[in-house]
């Protein structure tokens, strides 16, 4: 019996066609399987009823590459936070965020995260491994199937640092664009910034939306919040972002989590405005969602509005992004962290 080289979801249409022929089936069966995987939500060969029954039974053991929903938490705003169990038993987080005109999926790119941002729940659990591209695509398919609605937008803002898994993230982006049919500009890759990685992404000439988690207007404050930033001076990060704009023609979005009394004062806004002067950019202000592991607090509405107004006065495009699904522990890492004792039995220790 011919072995499957990889989970079927990880294979391109040409690869599926080649594989199915090694099992004695005609080439057109590859297209049928491809349609079952991406259009009909099949999770086993048994479900692919227009394929020969004897062949399906003979090859039923071949892996498809779909995760299993371990848990789902639903917030009053209808945001759904999923814990998905992978083939090796590890757990990742995925969030489905519905609105009147779109369905957005927040996907993870790694199991855990090595960045250890001290206000983030995911970083508290450490890094375990990179996700394969099909494990990223599976998250989008799962949300699409659960909501019975086409996914319009995907943001790489879940567990993990996407640029530390760049080859698989790019492969997933290409699949989501070319196979699932989501426009590149509706795909957002977010990073805390890593030396050399932003330029590597720029050289791919993707037309995705690119977001950088900035969170501070100066190097000293930034590296106190993001330990990995000590290896990447803020001035170099901003220079690489300018190079990204020049290479791709796409603006950079800066994400800025507002922490009460830490980085949310008018003086911080003024300093940030000076840093971003003349930059083709947009700033997303994100009021902090408190987690049990750390003592940071959310600013008041007045503080949030004051910070935004300072940036606006300097003619910097700014918006305030209120995280969805807070009641469901849906901010990055929170649901998984809230079940860490149970997950400890499932997750191998490094």
UniProtKB/Swiss-Prot annotation:
Biological processes, Gene Ontology terms: rRNA base methylation; tRNA methylation
Keywords carried by this UniProt record: 4Fe-4S, Cytoplasm, Disulfide bond, Iron, Iron-sulfur, Metal-binding, Methyltransferase, rRNA processing, S-adenosyl-L-methionine, Transferase, tRNA processing
Protein EC: 2.1.1.192
Main subcellular localisation: cytoplasm
GO cellular component, one term: cytoplasm
Disulfide links within the chain: 106-332
UniProt remark on cofactor binding: Binds 1 [4Fe-4S] cluster. The cluster is coordinated with 3 cysteines and an exchangeable S-adenosyl-L-methionine.
Reaction(s) the record says it catalyses: adenosine(2503) in 23S rRNA + 2 reduced [2Fe-2S]-[ferredoxin] + 2 S-adenosyl-L-methionine = 2-methyladenosine(2503) in 23S rRNA + 5'-deoxyadenosine + L-methionine + 2 oxidized [2Fe-2S]-[ferredoxin] + S-adenosyl-L-homocysteine; adenosine(37) in tRNA + 2 reduced [2Fe-2S]-[ferredoxin] + 2 S-adenosyl-L-methionine = 2-methyladenosine(37) in tRNA + 5'-deoxyadenosine + L-methionine + 2 oxidized [2Fe-2S]-[ferredoxin] + S-adenosyl-L-homocysteine
UniProt-recorded Gene Ontology molecular function terms: 4 iron, 4 sulfur cluster binding; metal ion binding; rRNA (adenine(2503)-C2-)-methyltransferase activity; rRNA binding; tRNA (adenine(37)-C2)-methyltransferase activity; tRNA binding
Residues of the Radical SAM core domain: 99-327
CDD domains hit by this protein: Radical_SAM (cd01335)
Subcellular location: Cytoplasm
Binding site for S-adenosyl-L-methionine: 160-161, 190, 213-215, 289
Residues that, per the record, bind [4Fe-4S] cluster: 113, 117, 120
Active site: 93 (proton acceptor), 332 (s-methylcysteine intermediate)
Function (record text): Specifically methylates position 2 of adenine 2503 in 23S rRNA and position 2 of adenine 37 in tRNAs.
Further facts: Reaction proceeds by a ping-pong mechanism involving intermediate methylation of a conserved cysteine residue.
Family to which this protein belongs: Belongs to the radical SAM superfamily. RlmN family.
Annotated protein name in UniProt: Probable dual-specificity RNA methyltransferase RlmN
Organism of provenance: Synechocystis sp. (strain ATCC 27184 / PCC 6803 / Kazusa)
Lineage: Bacteria, Bacillati, Cyanobacteriota, Cyanophyceae, Synechococcales
Record gene name: rlmN
């Amino acid at each position: 019996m011919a072995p499957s080289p990889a989970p079927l979801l990880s294979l391109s249409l040409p690869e599926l066609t080649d594989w199915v022929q090694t099992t004695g089936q005609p080439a057109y069966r590859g297209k049928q399987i491809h349609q079952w995987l991406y259009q009909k939500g099949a999770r086993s060969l048994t479900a692919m009823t227009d394929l020969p029954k004897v062949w399906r039974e003979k090859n039923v053991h071949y892996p498809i590459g779909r995760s299993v929903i371990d848990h789902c938490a639903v917030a009053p705003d209808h945001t759904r936070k999923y814990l998905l169990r992978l083939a090796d038993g590890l757990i990742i987080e995925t969030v489905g965020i519905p609105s009147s005109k779109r369905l957005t999926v927040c996907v993870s790119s790694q199991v855990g995260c090595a960045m250890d941002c001290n206000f983030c729940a995911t970083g508290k659990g450490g890094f375990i491994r990179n996700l394969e591209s099909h494990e990223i695509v599976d998250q989008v398919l799962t949300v699409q199937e659960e909501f019975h609605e086409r996914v319009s937008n995907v943001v790489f803002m879940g567990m993990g640092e996407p640029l530390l898994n760049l080859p698989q993230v790019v492969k997933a982006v290409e699949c989501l664009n070319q196979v699932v049919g989501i426009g590149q500009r509706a795909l957002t890759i977010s990073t805390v910034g890593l030396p050399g990685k932003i330029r590597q992404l720029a050289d791919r000439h993707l037309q995705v939306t690119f977001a950088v988690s900035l969170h501070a207007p100066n190097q000293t404050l930034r590296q106190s919040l993001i330990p990995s930033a000590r290896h990447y001076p803020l001035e170099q990060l901003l220079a690489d972002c300018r190079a990204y704009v020049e290479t791709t023609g796409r603006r950079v979005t800066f994400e800025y989590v507002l922490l009460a009394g830490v980085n949310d004062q008018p003086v911080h806004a003024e300093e940030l405005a000076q840093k971003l002067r003349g930059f083709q950019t947009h700033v997303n202000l994100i009021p902090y969602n408190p987690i049990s592991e750390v003592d940071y607090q959310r600013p008041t509405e007045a503080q949030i509005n004051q910070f935004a107004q300072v940036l606006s006065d300097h003619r910097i495009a700014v918006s305030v992004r209120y995280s969805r699904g807070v009641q469901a522990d849906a901010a990055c890492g929170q649901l998984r962290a809230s079940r860490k004792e149970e997950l400890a039995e499932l997750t191998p220790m490094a």
